[in-house]
UniProtKB/Swiss-Prot annotation:
Function: Essential cell division protein. May link together the upstream cell division proteins, which are predominantly cytoplasmic, with the downstream cell division proteins, which are predominantly periplasmic.
Membrane topology recorded in Swiss-Prot or TrEMBL: Single-pass type II membrane protein
UniProt xrefs under HAMAP family: FtsB
Residue ranges of the TM segments: 4-21
Protein name (record): Cell division protein FtsB
Regions of this protein lying in the Periplasmic compartment: 22-92
GO cellular component, one term: cell septum
Keyword rRNA processing attributed: no
Cytoplasmic side: 1-3
UniProt KW keywords: Cell cycle, Cell division, Cell inner membrane, Cell membrane, Coiled coil, Membrane, Transmembrane, Transmembrane helix
Length: 92
């Protein structure tokens, strides 16, 4: 009977060791959950960026307004018959 108790105690210690310090331990599981949360947040940010870029590509492919806006902002494009006004703020 004493021998069975020793064997069962040893098996329990082995199971507890793998639970607390092994490859699939509780600490590692917690660390992986934190990494997953961080990665999901990054993925969500990138998905929003991708959606925005896809909408911009669609506008560039299907409409002239996006092209005109980019030309105005980045290149200073002014169409015929338009008047350009530049407003300058004075910091006082």
């Amino acid at each position: 009977m004493k021998w069975v108790t020793v064997v069962l105690s040893f098996a329990l210690v082995c199971c507890q060791y793998s639970l607390w310090f092994g490859k699939g331990s509780i600490g590692r599981n917690s660390s992986l959950r934190e990494q997953i949360a961080v990665q999901e947040e990054k993925n969500q940010t990138l998905a929003l960026r991708n959606h925005s870029l896809a909408a911009e590509v669609y506008d560039l492919e299907n409409g002239q307004e996006a092209i005109s806006e980019i030309a105005r902002v980045e290149l200073g494009y002014i169409q015929d018959g338009e008047t350009f006004y530049r407003l300058i703020r004075h910091n006082r």
